[in-house]
Amino acid sequence: RWLPGAMDLSVPGAFAMTEIGHGSDVASIATTATYDEATQEFVIHTPFKGAWKDYLGNAALHGRAATVFAQLITRGVNHGVHCFYVPIRDEEGAFLPGVGGEDDGLKGGLNGIDNGRLHFTQVRIPRTNLLNRYGDVAEDGTYSSPIASPGRRFFTMLGTLVQGRVSLSLAATTASFLGLHGALAYAEQRRQFKASDPQREEVLPVSYTHL
């Protein structure tokens, strides 16, 4: 039900996993999603500043919803990290009640992406906003999952990120290769500076053995 808005860009989104205090160690993120049986809602909460979600694309200005990774808690039991769909701004761009954030400011590159931070203070979302492919919570708070092992469940959930990180490394390697290829092609054609013999052609940059 949320895919159409994401696909047609009518609802710009943010991927809210990384926290100020936890980047690669996703299993230890501190944001919580506590289930309230009385209202059948999850309460998304950031307990301290180290748990603020950080360096999120679209978070600083334009994001209207976020997929928030948090520790899922039901009946006092922590079932580990799960993902939740959380609206963060209204149509005018103002933060919704309980949601706050700030811009990450200028970066070393890619400043066209409005990276920012988000934090949540007792933000309530419907039970059905849990992205429940790998774990679900019934109306009475009963937790269930098709993957019994918490460790296997966690790594299965994050499996898609592995492909993304490999793709990023491949893209960087490809860009480096293309840059080197262009530089060598130029160095084999460009000529400048005459040798001591005026009858000789100007020198190719690739002919130099030392800079």
Which residues make up each language-model segment?
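Mobile "lid/hinge" segments at catalytic clefts and subdomain interfaces of large enzymes
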Residues: 172-175
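Long, structured ligand/cofactor-binding scaffold of large enzymes
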Residues: 1-35, 41, 48, 53, ...
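Conserved small/polar residues in nucleotide/adenosyl-binding loops
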Residues: 209-210
